[in-house]
Design a protein with these regions (language model features):
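Extracellular Ig-like/FN3 beta-sandwich strand-entry sites
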Residues: 540, 569-573
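Short acidic/polar inter-strand loop motif in beta-rich domains
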Residues: 551-555, 580-587
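Low-complexity, Pro/Ser/Thr- and charge-rich linker/hinge segments at domain boundaries
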Residues: 434-460, 588-622
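Mature extracytoplasmic or organellar-lumen-exposed domains after removal of signal/transit peptides
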Residues: 580, 587-589, 622-748
């Protein structure tokens, strides 16, 4: 014997690994719950610290033993100083999530147990922020292997599990919990056959959609509580194969392994029918499927005929048909990596294998049906994601930018597909509307109806249309795009310009876009941004309308401290028109109100009317300023050709009048950022400031804005009158005199 240190072999079944330093035969590493090192050939051992725990692999640089990479349940870490310190794992998206649940709040939250950590609750969107950060997630009920259950409309109380039947009920308001075990028995170290309740590592817990306040929890049988865990009752017999020869001590012949992960003969999944009260299905880790249609009073074995012993990892009741049910099974524990999805259309009486198209090796863990489009299925496998458009007759990969990693669970929720991975955290596919509308590629152009958008404020790297962004960013999660995400297909590329218009319910144009972008746009400091350009590529195109009204014009080469973007369109239904050549396609786009915004009836409409009129006024002002400034410059050139002194003097007087008006409207000395501190704002800058000061996340027109606009509108009335007179009377009259003198006129 080299060492009697129990730490070396305490959980040999799970993770004990031995590594020798390639540069020193007396340096040995043993990975277990701790990472241990001996520098004297195993006589004494020291513990490496600085990373997570539960160690599985180690790489030692053969040219430099100080450089190591270690892997554990928290990710990977790098050391360059012989393990004295390690790189942080907190910035690495390496979480392993088992089972997904989500609430119905906005933004909705995702819940799951995270391997060797707490359970997690994380927002799907960070309102008012640019990305999903640490402030958007917290712990939830249960532990690392938790199923989490709650009323999705009121998720104050969350019931979460952990291994060996540990359950607690978390009050998210008080941030306190109570333990609600079905039987508070210490099972650690016991043989499975000696356990009253034999729990799966991921023992199912579900909240009943049809019985308020009722939760179900599964061991080898089903238990129910109707009083938040105060009492539990058995509502099924043993629904497993109950094989005694597989219920001994785990990990033998080396060490006993009895922490729950190795339990066998347990219920691995339970689901309630969304259509019918009292209808539940269970699936066991040894290959049995059962159904009850009377709330557990009686159960029927509906296991597919000929199904071998396997893990029934997920069950899905079709959201479109009460009699249709899907199961995802796997036999990887038998070294069989064959995908095996099954479908029944008669409550499990008969089954068909629907795995065609999923390659060998991609064994199946979960299948879900889309909530809007019947027969649109999503499957998560050991090697990635698959989709079927025809109820499982044929599958194809939809890996896209998703890391190639095991998919442990899927959930279709609020128009999104939420993905739980083994080692690459949560991912969300936001654009299920496109999947729901998809048909085989056509030769003609096609415009798809976008998913509804919320009129909320947040930033997202998904707002742009650049193909270079791959859907992830360092350190933080990615917010979904803020706006209507519009997809369209183009059959071929040519010189034809494509254009898009957005109209409100009254038919008024809110904004418009073109594949040629802003013709004649000029960029300068303190000026407006360009109007986004419509992408134009053969095949599928993606364009995000940020819900904004048209960008207001600026005044060339004048710096105004302001935002020129139009205010955001208010909740309602809008018409989207796409013109490709002579063909015009239309669809609708829906904007929803953010539920958490405190608004009153008519508030959005009042805000929209105020902002629309104010922005229209500013647009008119700047158009007039630009037009008269252009006319003044033309007049200056024309006067250089005039010999008649009287006519020249009259022209100079007209120029001075235009210039005086212009100086009241804009500050032409302001050319750069800090110039606004040196030169006072003029009229349009004040007006634009009012627009920006009134625009806000929660639409509200304060009395101060109303009063300020009255003041400015009174000033504008006089300025506009003078400008119109210059444009329609004085310049045209002088033009007549120029024509009479045989000199070209000023163009307006």
């Amino acid at each position: 014997m080299v060492s009697a240190d129990n730490r070396l072999t305490q959980r040999a079944w799970y993770y004990t690994e031995v590594f020798t330093d390639p540069n020193n035969e007396n340096v040995v590493y043993v990975l277990s719950a701790p990472a241990l090192r001996s520098i004297d050939g195993g006589k004494t051992w020291e513990r490496l610290s600085g990373t997570h725990g539960d160690y599985h692999d180690l790489w030692i640089n053969p040219d430099n033993s100080k450089n190591m990479v270690i892997a554990n349940d928290g990710g990977a870490a790098v050391s360059f100083n012989y393990g004295k310190s390690w790189s942080t794992q907190s910035i690495m998206p390496t979480a392993q999530f088992y089972r997904i649940n989500a609430d119905n709040l906005f933004p909705y939250n995702i819940y799951a147990g995270q391997q060797d950590n707490t359970s997690v609750k994380i927002a799907s969107l960070s309102l008012g922020r640019g990305s999903i950060g640490r402030e958007d997630w917290t712990y939830s009920a249960g532990g690392e292997s938790a199923f989490l259950a709650f009323d999705p409309d009121n998720p104050r109380y969350v019931m979460g599990g952990s291994y060996l039947g540990n359950i607690n009920l978390l009050d998210t308001h008080s941030k306190a919990s109570t333990k609600v075990l079905t039987a508070p028995i210490q099972y650690l170290g016991r043989a499975a056959r000696d356990m009253k309740y034999l729990y799966n590592w991921n023992a199912p817990i579900i909240w009943s959609k049809h019985e308020p306040g009722t939760f179900y929890h599964c061991a080898q049988l089903v238990l129910r509580t109707r009083d938040m865990g105060m009492t539990w009752e058995e509502v099924s017999p043993d629904l497993t194969r109950n094989q005694d020869d597989k219920q001994g001590n785990g990990g033998r012949p080396y060490t006993n392994e009895a922490v729950g992960a190795e339990n066998y003969g347990t219920i691995a999944y339970m689901i309630e029918s969304p259509h019918e009260k009292g209808v539940f299905y269970t699936g066991s880790d040894d290959g049995l499927v059962h159904i009850t249609n009377n709330g557990g009073e009686s159960w029927q074995n509906v296991t597919p005929k000929g199904l071998q012993e396997c893990l029934v990892n997920a069950i899905e009741v079709s959201p479109h048909d009460p009699a249709t049910v899907y199961i995802a099974t796997t036999r990887y524990k038998f070294n069989d990596y064959t995908p095996a999805l099954y479908k029944s259309t008669d409550y499990g009486k008969t089954w068909s294998n629907i795995s065609s198209g999923i390659p060998q090796g991609s064994f199946t863990r979960v299948v879900r049906e889309d909530k809007d489009r019947k027969n649109l299925l999503y499957a998560g496998t050991e090697k990635g994601m698959y989709v079927s458009w025809n109820g499982g007759q044929k599958w194809e990969s939809i890996q896209l930018n998703l890391p190639k990693t095991p998919i442990l669970d899927l959930m279709v929720h609020q128009g999104d597909l939420i993905v739980a991975t083994s080692g690459r955290s949560f991912w969300i596919l936001d654009d299920l509307g496109l999947f729901r509308a998809y048909e085989k590629p056509q030769m003609a152009a096609k415009l798809y109806e976008p998913e509804a958008a919320y009129n909320g404020f947040w930033y997202s790297a998904m707002n742009g249309n650049s193909p270079s962004f791959k859907g992830s960013q360092p350190f933080t999660g990615v917010n979904p795009a803020n706006g209507l995400v519009i997809y369209y297909e183009l059959p071929k590329l040519d010189s034809t310009e494509i254009s898009m218009e957005i109209r409100d319910a009254k038919g008024k144009v809110i904004n418009s876009f073109s594949s040629k972008g802003d013709k004649g746009y000029k960029r300068y400091d303190g000026g407006p941004p360009p109007t986004p350009k419509l992408p134009k590529s053969q095949g599928l195109n993606r364009f995000v309308w940020n819900l904004g009204h048209a960008i207001m014009p600026g005044v060339d080469d004048i710096y105004i401290e302001a935002n020129y973007r139009g205010h955001r369109a208010i909740p309602g239904t809008y018409t989207i028109s796409l013109k490709v050549g002579d063909k015009i396609m239309q669809t609708k786009g829906v904007i929803k109100e953010v539920p958490s915004y405190d608004t009153t009836p008519g508030q959005y409409e009042t805000f929209d009317a105020f902002m629309t009129e104010t922005e229209a006024n500013l647009t008119e002002m700047h158009q007039m300023v630009n037009g008269l400034f252009k006319a003044k410059n033309q007049l200056k050139k024309v006067l250089e050709k005039v010999d008649d002194e009287g006519l020249k003097k009259e022209g100079k007087t007209l120029m001075d009048e235009i210039d005086a008006w212009d100086k009241e409207m804009v500050q032409r000395k302001s050319k750069a950022y800090d110039d606004v501190e040196n030169f006072p704002n003029k009229f349009t800058a004040e007006y634009l400031y009012l627009i920006n000061a009134t625009d806000s996340s929660i639409p509200r027109v304060n009395q101060s804005s109303v009063e300020r606009r009255k003041e400015l509108d009174a000033q504008w009335s006089g300025l506009k009158q003078r400008g119109v007179a210059l444009k329609t009377i004085k310049i045209p009259e002088f033009n007549k005199k120029l024509w009479a003198a045989g000199i070209g006129a000023v163009q307006l």
